[in-house]
Amino acid sequence: MERNNRKVFTGRVVSDKMDKTIVVAVETKVRHKLYGKRVNYTKKYKAHDENNVAKVGDIVRIAETRPLSKDKRFRLVTVVEESVII
């Protein structure tokens, strides 16, 4: 599988409690086939964060990679936008 063929998602970090692992919620908008209404779907992915740079609330980009554990199939590419702490 080529590196360019791999899936790349952008989502929000919802958990960073594990060491070197983040949970990213990716939201997609799909039009309902019968009713035509736009429906939001959210799916959570566990991603590898080698240096623990991503924090809860950050917008990050993750890319598909080889299986790193039972659930981890993605790695952190970049932090697109850092969360604002008030």
Curated annotation (Swiss-Prot):
One Gene Ontology molecular-function label: structural constituent of ribosome
Pfam families in UniProt: Ribosomal_S17
Domain of life assignment: Bacteria
Cited PROSITE patterns: RIBOSOMAL_S17
Secreted among keywords: no
Keyword terms, alphabetized: Ribonucleoprotein, Ribosomal protein, RNA-binding, rRNA-binding
GO cellular component: cytosolic small ribosomal subunit
UniProt GO BP: translation
Function: One of the primary rRNA binding proteins, it binds specifically to the 5'-end of 16S ribosomal RNA.
Record's subunit section: Part of the 30S ribosomal subunit.
PANTHER family cross-referenced by the UniProt entry: 40S RIBOSOMAL PROTEIN S11 FAMILY MEMBER, SMALL RIBOSOMAL SUBUNIT PROTEIN US17M
Similarity field: Belongs to the universal ribosomal protein uS17 family.
Protein name per UniProt: Small ribosomal subunit protein uS17
Lineage, uppermost ranks: Bacteria, Bacillati, Bacillota, Bacilli, Bacillales
Gene: rpsQ
